[in-house]
Amino acid sequence: MLTEKMFFKNIAECGKNKRRKGGRKMYVGKKVTRVDAYDKVIGRTRYTDDLCDKGAYVARILHSTIANGKVVSIDTTEAEKIPGVVKVCTCFDLKEKHYFPTAGHPWSTDESHQDVADRLVLTDRVRFYGDDIAAVIAEDEVSAAQALRAIKVEYEEYPFVLDVHEAMKDGAPQLHENYPNNILKHTTIRKGNYEEAIKEPGLIKVEGWYSTPPVQHCHIENFICYAEKEAERIKIVSSTQIPHIVRRVCGQALGIDWGKIRIIKPYIGGGFGNKQDVLYEPLCAWLCLQVGGHLVKLDVPREETFVSTRVRHAIHSHIVSWVRPDGTFVARKLEAFSDQGAYASHGHSICAKGVGAFPQLYPCENVEADAYTVFTNKSV
């Protein structure tokens, strides 16, 4: 068992390492104790929820109950009567619509390299079951939950599509105007001459479809953040993997200078890529402003993380290999279809990166590879 005495003894031993010129320590070949290890082992580490003041308002999100359509009206009358409810905000309360991207990518001044800005903090144009259409701010969790159940929503429903191959067909429901056949992006790799290579006599054809399912990351700590007005800035504390990008995106979402946003990232209880996307920080900050800058906490329940945060994309791949009897590859072909869900998020980067590795898997002089990232009415 690692005791406090042993912990500090290890640190002292590390300090005895010989120093290079200029006073720099030599760590190569030495035992180095993680600076965060002891606090985590004894349970002293503080996570996002531990740091939030008890006087915070609680926010809960109302998600859509249809896969594709438009919100016609939202009746909040009964919800607002519930004791403890501070405010009910809907997609119709957005005075200005600032679309923003969510991917954990660096920002580019070249518009062609920028991530797709297709999200709003709350939307009246629903694209998947679980889209964010309203939010409740209350003094406690019980009041917030009761208010959610009291809200009445009227929709105009549209046809939906859940399969990537169906989504690419002519006449399929279109999720976004600027992406015909719901194709977010299509990229190709060409090496050698596939069509000529497969004419070689005696080749063995190996062909099949291979699919990976969508996977939820299931980190122990659900997504959580809280926001409050701090002088002329908005302070947001979030269990994110990308604090600097969250700062920029929150500025874009609120239509304010990035310098007026302060992000604090405590220890996080797992992320595994789910928190490498901007999730509900912009919404939490916007809700904070709706109640005069008062502290607002948004803790997403486990059930909602499966539907309304992020998943690893399902990818369906068709692979054809032409092989000589001695086992050497002559030509290989791949078509990969990534089910992006309703919004761009990290966009084509996931599928493109996977397909980019295809020519490197086996020695082969003739390769064709196509990557398609496709919108469907499903979770992102």
Language-model features: locations:
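Short Pro/Gly-enriched beta-strand edge/turn motifs at strand-loop
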Residues: 105-108, 200-215, 298-306, 346
